């Protein structure tokens, strides 16, 4: 089920068993394919331009509230808790779990079944926790998600 106040940009593709929560947005040319297992996207989250969100049998994709998935990221069969920023072109693979209040840096690769603890900054290939986030950084993740809610008001919705 896609909430009635979700904003979906022209060119985005959403198929299969997909649930998207209130005030979330899906941007230009993003692909969300719940054709093999389910995909759940929480409230106030955004899937930015050219992202791919997919799953594998037995590996649903679960994305929490206040999550920003940056341009070109690939999110596949993993769990992302609340208040997370996934940087541009990052990849998160099957069975990975990202704890709340994390930043996954641009181009980082979170490998299969990797668990990232809450409040972590992850960088590199393969992705490694490099330090704990500051309170200011944690706050900025939610602020970014809320900026996308506001920005999505300029979209015509193509549900």
Swiss-Prot record:
Zn(2+) binds at residues 54, 71, 76. It comes from the Archaea. Its cofactor is Zn(2+). CDD domains: LbH_gamma_CA_like. Disulfide bonds: none annotated. One of its GO terms (molecular function) is metal ion binding. It is an enzyme of class 4 (lyase). Keywords: Lyase, Metal-binding, Zinc. Substrate binds at residues 33-35, 48-49. The keyword ATP-binding does not apply. Its EC number is 4.2.1.1. It catalyses: hydrogencarbonate + H(+) = CO2 + H2O. Belongs to the gamma-class carbonic anhydrase family. Probably reversibly hydrates carbon dioxide. This is Probable carbonic anhydrase. It comes from Methanocaldococcus jannaschii (strain ATCC 43067 / DSM 2661 / JAL-1 / JCM 10045 / NBRC 100440). The lineage of its organism: Archaea, Methanobacteriati, Methanobacteriota, Methanomada group, Methanococci.
């Amino acid at each position: 089920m896609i909430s009635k106040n979700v904003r979906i940009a022209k060119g985005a593709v959403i198929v299969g068993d997909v649930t998207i929560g209130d005030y979330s947005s899906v941007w230009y040319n993003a692909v969300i394919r719940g054709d093999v297992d389910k995909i759940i996207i929480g409230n106030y989250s955004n899937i930015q331009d050219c992202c791919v969100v997919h799953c594998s049998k037995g590996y649903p994709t679960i994305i929490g509230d206040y999550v920003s998935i940056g341009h070109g990221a690939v999110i596949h069969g993993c769990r992302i808790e609340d208040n997370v920023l996934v940087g541009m072109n990052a990849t998160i693979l099957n069975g990975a779990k990202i704890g709340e209040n994390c930043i996954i840096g641009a181009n980082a690769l979170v490998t299969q079944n990797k668990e990232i603890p809450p409040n972590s900054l992850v960088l590199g290939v393969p992705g490694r926790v490099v330090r704990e986030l500051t309170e200011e950084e944690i706050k900025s993740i939610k602020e970014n998600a809320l900026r996308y809610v506001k920005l999505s008001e300029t979209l015509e919705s193509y549900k």
